[in-house]
């Protein structure tokens, strides 16, 4: 993989990983022209995106750790931990069952379309409720489950699934739902990336990697994800997610069309 392709894929990952539009769908399209990505490359660009969100929320994370004696912080942290543990346990079950990701774009396209329709419904339902910021235990449990659903059905979007489950479960404030979804995603994605990294090294998958290309992709993904998430957090203060829902539906239809015409597998 040349350095320009590595940078382009880093940009795509950085933009799409935490926006509710599915990084998987975009990377599949890019793969048709930029070549197949190794497991190591996928891990590296995702790690860059996770680092960006960690940097954005470092003060919030530090407050939760240092202020653990405060009931509000302790309660919030406990809900984050429970959501993460639910994802971790269900993730191990999915691995044990031998679940395999789809090899064609069609299921991903349908996940994009259905997810887009679901997002519009969730926004409509949330608008009919008081815009409170409370994260309930039900929200925490459902967010943990939603992360696994997004992993099992690529194209769903982890951020999209978790944010809109939180909205439907009673957190009527978009900013509060997004923050909880992103904070849960930090340990979840670090754990998943760490697991895959160890597995890749164990299987010899790191041999022959172009470490310069990996470094470029990592740095680009980190910078772009930082900008994208900062923009998203500002955007949702006064705007709904409807624009993303429409975009998902259009992308899903485009993928179905490209599959039907043989442009992609």
Curated annotation (Swiss-Prot):
GO terms for molecular function: undecaprenyl-diphosphatase activity. GO terms for biological process: cell wall organization; peptidoglycan biosynthetic process; regulation of cell shape; response to antibiotic. Its EC number is 3.6.1.27. It comes from Rhizobium etli (strain ATCC 51251 / DSM 11541 / JCM 21823 / NBRC 15573 / CFN 42). InterPro entries: UppP. Catalyzes the dephosphorylation of undecaprenyl diphosphate (UPP). Confers resistance to bacitracin. It catalyses: di-trans,octa-cis-undecaprenyl diphosphate + H2O = di-trans,octa-cis-undecaprenyl phosphate + phosphate + H(+). It is a multi-pass membrane protein. One of its GO terms (cellular component) is plasma membrane. This is Undecaprenyl-diphosphatase.
